């Protein structure tokens, strides 16, 4: 590929040059959510402090509030520390006067077996209606998950669309010679190490069921593709053919994996059973074809190729065949990610000397830049298609960010220090 490798973002250096990672692990795998920006049509909502939450290890109300703010759909109304449980009907007129269209109340109660009873209720202050609620009996370790589920309930009730707060993200890091694959909540908290290795780990990709993660490991001194069972920690070898094995992408039904293999010389796209087996070649070019991504209907594969002289995004039938160029603005476009609703493609474009996150309307073919940072990488859509997670540099630090599709609301999932790379947003699964 005719590119200056010194100018490439980290992910493409890994995929095309198959070099060692050069990023640093955060001092700790905990994140702080920082939300910036204001949307034009945000819904004002008040989330009260849950009665009894001081007895728990998590502030349920604060987590629900942060989730809703990060979505870009809601604007929080100050509750002035009000503590309200779900069992008593609040004075909704007071909250309407505070400009809150909705109100969330709840409680957290310790149980005799060590678990916690978490209850909540959602109120419509404008119509004076009880919009319902739920209750969960959870362990201390699942208190955050219960808060995310509350936020999911609120989001779906008020927007008519499924919430994504109880979903998960995966990403990779490096500290010294230690490379780690992490799985975390959608807000970046509760990070758990899925795999650690002295050799690089790259390209994590969630299966459609959310039970598996495909990734590329260099532990055998060459890039090899594995599938990792998230619940059990067991893994299965998927592709270890001659040459490199990289950039795995799951088919929409989870039965197949498309990847870039160089078993016949050049780097081309191949499809194989998700459990491994003999691959079938999909592309027949003399160029580098990499970074495959399936369309929402599973009928089309988008990928990056330099067959036109510079890296651009193409698409072809999932069965293979002739490829059609998709990106035309600029001479460097990589990392396609398709929205689950089939409407958009996120990708990275080189603009001058910067790498910018772009969003393309697939129906019209028009693109818009939606970030103001200069080293964006690895976009991935939330399963409801309303947010994008990506890696970038901000204020001299590597970080994960989420953004709304219009770029107006961004949330930084920032560690204390160091680098975080290659996020992939998991499906609705829990």
Annotate the PLM regions:
Residues 31, 88-153:
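Amphipathic beta-strand/beta-sheet edge segments enriched in Tyr/Trp
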Residues 35-94, 104, 108-109:
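Short beta-strand->alpha-helix linker/helix-N-cap micro-motif
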Residues 126, 185-189, 229-233, 273-277, ...:
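Short loop/turn segments that connect beta-strands within beta-propeller blades
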Residues 162, 173-180, 196-199, 216-225, ...:
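A flexible loop/linker signature enriched in serine peptidases of the S9 family
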Residues 163-165, 208-209, 252-253, 296-297, ...:
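Residue-level detector of Asp-centered blade-edge/turn motifs that repeat once per structural unit
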Residues 169, 213, 254-258, 298-301, ...:
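Hydrophobic beta-strand positions that form the internal "hydrophobic ladder"
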Residues 398-430:
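Blade-level signature of beta-propeller repeat domains, shared across WD40, Kelch, NHL, RCC1
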């Amino acid at each position: 590929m005719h590119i200056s490798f010194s100018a490439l973002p980290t992910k493409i250096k890994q995929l095309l040059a198959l070099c060692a990672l050069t990023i640093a692990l955060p001092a700790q795998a905990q994140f702080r959510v920082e939300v910036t920006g204001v949307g034009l049509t945000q819904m004002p909502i008040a989330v009260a402090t849950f009665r009894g939450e001081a007895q728990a290890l998590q502030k349920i109300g604060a987590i629900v509030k942060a989730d809703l703010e990060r979505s870009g759909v809601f604007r929080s109304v100050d509750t002035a520390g009000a503590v309200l449980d779900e069992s008593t009907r609040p004075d909704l007129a007071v909250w309407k006067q505070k400009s809150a269209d909705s109100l969330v109340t709840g409680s957290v109660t310790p149980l005799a077996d060590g678990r916690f009873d978490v209850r909540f209720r959602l109120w419509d202050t404008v119509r004076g209606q009880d919009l319902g609620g739920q209750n969960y009996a959870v362990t201390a370790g699942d208190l955050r998950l219960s808060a995310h589920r509350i936020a999911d309930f609120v989001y779906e009730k008020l927007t008519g669309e499924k919430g994504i707060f109880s979903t998960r993200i995966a990403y990779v890091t490096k500290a010294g010679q230690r490379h780690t694959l992490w799985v975390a909540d959608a807000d970046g908290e509760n990070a758990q190490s899925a795999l650690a290795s002295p050799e690089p780990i790259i390209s994590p990709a969630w299966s459609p069921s959310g039970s598996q993660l495909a990734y590329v490991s260099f532990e055998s001194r060459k890039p090899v593709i594995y599938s990792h069972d998230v619940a059990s920690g067991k893994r299965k070898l998927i592709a270890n053919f001659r040459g490199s094995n990289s950039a795995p992408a799951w088919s929409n039904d989870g039965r197949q994996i498309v990847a870039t293999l160089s078993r016949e010389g050049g780097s081309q796209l191949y499809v194989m059973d998700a459990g491994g087996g003999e691959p079938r070649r999909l592309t027949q070019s003399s160029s580098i074809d990499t970074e495959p991504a399936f369309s929402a209907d599973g009928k089309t594969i988008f990928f990056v190729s330099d067959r036109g002289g510079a890296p651009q995004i193409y698409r072809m039938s999932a069965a293979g065949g002739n490829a059609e160029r998709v990106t035309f603005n600029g001479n460097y476009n990589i990392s396609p990610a398709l929205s689950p609703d089939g409407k958009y493609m996120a990708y990275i474009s080189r603009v001058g000397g910067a790498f910018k996150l772009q969003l393309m309307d697939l129906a019209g073919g028009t693109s818009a830049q939606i970030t103001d940072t200069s080293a964006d990488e690895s976009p991935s859509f939330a399963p409801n298609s309303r947010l994008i997670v990506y890696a970038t540099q901000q204020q001299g630090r590597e970080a994960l960010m989420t953004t709304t599709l219009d770029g107006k609301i961004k949330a930084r999932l920032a560690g204390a220090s160091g680098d975080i790379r290659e996020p992939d947003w998991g499906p609705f699964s829990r």
